[in-house]
């Protein structure tokens, strides 16, 4: 059952009444531009047809009762008291954190509610189940309290909740695309100015996602380490963020930085070249040059593997299998924060079955893990449903 239907049905069962407010926020897949968001750079994701639905209704007090359908767990907290983490249930941090920072922006918001949350974004897959949940909660609060927040505000509140309440030092891409996505379009986002430029996905091109089922958990260190290394590199170049370093500027001082700290130099090289790849990818898409876009995706994967060092052998193998079928008709790369999760492929629709088949025949045999294969549609951002 789709989360939109499930959340409504479960709400009636749990609370013996009908929901009066229903919202839905999609997950996302990033086509190109990995780890560039927290470097004030460029990204090019699309919202996907998997996401998080919330059904709810006002209460006549200040209490939030939250039922997470997929985990079969409840949480409750009050909006007229300080909102603090519930360490025994990690998922509650995404809900409580968003409500806390909505209140920080709109101190008058104290309206209680009963909620049911249902989602179908695979957890720990790199498809932004957390951002989808944060944006859905933010939109629910905005509509519940008729608050003066737009969808960009809601995205940034979600990011703040993940940074300061949950403790994952993520950038703003995942929340922005969940909030601002457009059907049938990729969205190039400037993560500094927050400007977005929609780019249509050609009709004959499929967006494929393959989940490696190698679990990743970004709160556990490596992601935050990469972020610190990028900040160290920005200081070395005397700039606010690596977004401000051109490839030429990087190459001039690359040997000097490598002598100081070879790992930091590699991390910076990925970010500086990846930003340029996103700009080149937007140009390629606007000129319907899918072959060039594919080259850029493939190069992005090599950079993540060798310079940013965030892939795994299983992920590299999936990419190799997909690329062997796609050839010059598109591309494939790891997507998401890394250390597991998913790969994304762009290719003509008539190649989908062959990609699915080569992975089904080889991946489990080599890794002992069974992949999940999704063909996705670029979808609308957060909305009432």
UniProtKB/Swiss-Prot annotation:
GO molecular function list: ATP binding; galactokinase activity; magnesium ion binding
Pathway: Carbohydrate metabolism; galactose metabolism
Site-annotated residues for Transition state stabilizer: 28
Gene Ontology annotations of biological process type: galactose metabolic process
Listed GO CC annotations: cytosol
Family as reported in the entry's similarity comment: Belongs to the GHMP kinase family. GalK subfamily.
Catalytic activity: alpha-D-galactose + ATP = alpha-D-galactose 1-phosphate + ADP + H(+)
Function: Catalyzes the transfer of the gamma-phosphate of ATP to D-galactose to form alpha-D-galactose-1-phosphate (Gal-1-P).
Chain residues that bind substrate: 34-37, 223
Active site: 174
EC number, UniProt record: 2.7.1.6
Annotated positions binding Mg(2+): 130, 162
Name this protein carries in UniProt: Galactokinase
Species, as recorded: Actinobacillus succinogenes (strain ATCC 55618 / DSM 22257 / CCUG 43843 / 130Z)
Subcellular location: Cytoplasm
UniProt cross-references to PROSITE patterns, sorted A to Z: GALACTOKINASE, GHMP_KINASES_ATP
InterPro entries named among the record's database cross-references: Galactokinase, Galactokinase_bac, Galactokinase_CS, GalKase_N, GHMP_kinase_C_dom, GHMP_kinase_C_sf, GHMP_kinase_N_dom, GHMP_knse_ATP-bd_CS
């Amino acid at each position: 059952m789709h989360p939109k239907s499930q959340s409504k049905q479960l709400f009636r069962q749990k609370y013996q009444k009908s929901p009066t407010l229903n919202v839905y926020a999609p997950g996302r897949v990033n086509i190109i531009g990995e780890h560039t968001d927290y470097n004030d750079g460029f990204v090019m994701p699309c919202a996907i047809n998997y996401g998080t639905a919330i059904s709810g209704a006002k209460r006549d007090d200040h209490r939030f009762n939250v039922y997470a359908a997929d985990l079969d767990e409840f949480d409750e907290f009050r909006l007229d008291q300080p909102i603090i983490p519930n360490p025994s249930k990690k998922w509650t941090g995404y809900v409580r954190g968003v409500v806390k920072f909505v209140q920080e922006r709109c101190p008058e918001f104290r309206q209680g509610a009963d909620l049911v949350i249902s989602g179908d974004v695979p957890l720990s897959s790199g498809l932004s189940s957390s951002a989808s949940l944060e944006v859905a909660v933010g939109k629910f609060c905005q509509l519940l309290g008729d608050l003066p927040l737009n969808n960009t505000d809601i995205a940034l509140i979600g990011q703040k909740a993940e940074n300061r309440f949950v403790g994952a030092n993520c950038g703003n891409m995942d929340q922005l695309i969940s909030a601002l996505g457009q059907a049938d379009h990729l969205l190039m986002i400037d993560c500094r100015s927050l400007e977005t430029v929609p780019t249509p996905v050609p009709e004959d091109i499929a967006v494929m996602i393959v989940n490696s089922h190698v679990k990743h958990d970004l709160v556990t260190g490596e992601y935050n380490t990469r972020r610190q290394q990028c900040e160290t590199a920005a200081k070395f170049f005397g700039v606010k963020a690596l977004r401000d370093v051109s490839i030429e500027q990087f190459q001039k001082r690359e040997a000097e930085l490598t002598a100081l700290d070879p790992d930091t130099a590699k991390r910076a090289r990925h970010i500086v070249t990846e930003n340029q790849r996103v700009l080149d990818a937007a140009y390629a898409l606007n000129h319907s040059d899918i072959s060039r876009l594919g080259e850029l995706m493939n190069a992005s994967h090599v950079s993540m593997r060798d310079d940013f060092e965030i892939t795994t052998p299983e992920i590299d193998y999936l990419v190799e299998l997909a690329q062997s079928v796609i050839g010059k008709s598109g591309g494939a790369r790891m997507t998401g924060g890394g250390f597991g999760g998913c790969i994304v492929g762009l290719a003509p629709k008539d190649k989908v079955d062959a990609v699915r088949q080569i992975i089904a025949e080889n991946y489990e045999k080599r890794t002992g893990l069974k992949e999940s294969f999704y063909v996705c549609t670029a979808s609308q951002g957060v909305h009432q449903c």
